[in-house]
Amino acid sequence: SGESGKSKITARARYGVSTIANDNDFGMANLEEYVQYQRDARINAGYNPDDPTSEYYFPQAMAGRRATNWMKELTRNGSLQEYELIASGGAGKTTYYTSLSYNKTNGIVPTVGFEKMQIRANLDTELNKWLKMGTRLHGGYMKVSDVQNSLLGDSGLAPTNPFYSGMALAPTMNAYNEDGSYNFDLPFVFNVNPIAAIREQDKYDKQYKFNGTVYLEWKPIKQLTFRTNNSIEYATTTSRAYSPAFVNTASYGASLNTAESQYRILTTSNTITYDDLFNDDHSLNVLIGQEANAYESSFLQGISYHVNQQRPYHSVGVSVEDQRVGDGLTEMAMVSFFGVAEYNYKGRYYVKGSIRTDGSSKFGPDKRWGTFWAASASWNIHNEDFMQDIKSVLNQLKLRYSYGVNGNDNIASYAHYGLYSDVVYNGITGQLPSQLQNRKLTWETNKTHNIGIDFRLFD
């Protein structure tokens, strides 16, 4: 949050241009050089480039036609815009901080770009000398536009890669026909016009995201703090990838792949902290707490082939073979209880211990809970009295050791369920086990020892 007092407003703006580092035109031959190279190659091989009946016909007149600079056709100067507005301040026991930002980037390849908008608001207020509360709100929008290299996967040899097509295509090859339509007689790039492929495709991802947190903190005495944090995070994403028929090498014509997904995370965290210093020598910090979170995500995806290129959207009137639909839902939850205690004496001797118990819905009903702990100790030798004479040289000397057991739940949400899949055998449909049930599936545990020495000289 901001500071109590006079409000402060800050505005920032930035604009930039990006270009391709191209000091020598990528070493590419111009039209005259290319024609001369082709003619010399034919002559050196014993052929006559001026014989119109020969398949090696390549007359000098080719140098007089209009040249195509494919690299310039496939790229552009990129641009960057950034704007930000910040307001902060406060009055009395209340402080605030708000910001609004916008970013837009146009890439050096046409149709490639990035757009992002964010808004943020923080508010803190002291209700009385024992109680304070606050909130953190954040909302955002993001759009990423790209070019899909669907012809050859993500290979660098895809026609939509301007650095490949710009160098593979000769300056004698036309980008457009005389009637203004795209020229597809381009065998070096699989007869796909890269200009058309980049401009006529449509690929983007849009995301709207919100994150909100509210906290309440109660401090009945100086050493004791009760705090609760409660938050929600929600995001929804829309994706679209359309490829015209001339981009796809398969027989399914124009294709469209769209998807919508969203996720939600609810979290509550509640802690009690005791922090005190006794007789100026003994420091003690104890924290106990509880945390719970619930996660849910879902998606819906549709894929269509032989899409109407005049109206490139899904249609319910097409055959089943031309459409694919899929959806999914994932849910998981975790509950944790934990405690941490730290003690140090005169900044010389430190001990720390922690323990936590976690329950995860990812595991089987018989083994969902796991208990993990850690302990550590360290000795700041340089703070001892016998080290004072050399403290100006040896600025730090610490011995430390720790041991801990931690858990890992990084598995799929439904790995402990028994699952069946459809199967056809000898013309008869049935089901076959595809995943065995495991009620005892549980946490992966890792034990770690650490021992070390920290020192610093002449600082």
What residue ranges belong to the model's regions?
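A beta-strand signature from Gram-negative outer-membrane beta-barrel systems
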Residues: S1-R12, L80-E82, S101-N103
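Surface-exposed loop/interface segments of Gram-negative outer-membrane beta-barrel transport/assembly proteins
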Residues: S4-T68, I108-F114, Q118-K209, N229-V335, ...
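Transmembrane beta-strand segments that form the barrel wall of outer-membrane beta-barrel proteins
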Residues: A13, L100-N106, V351-S360
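Outer-membrane beta-barrel initiation region
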Residues: N24, I43, E73-N77, A87-A91, ...
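Solvent-exposed loop/turn segments connecting transmembrane beta-strands
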Residues: N77-L80, I108-P110, S361-K367
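Conserved alpha/beta core surface patches that mediate binding of polyanionic ligands
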Residues: S79-Y83, A333-F337, F458
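Extended, hydrophobic alpha-helical segments in both membrane/secreted and soluble proteins
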Residues: I119-A121, T228, T268-N270, V335-A341, ...
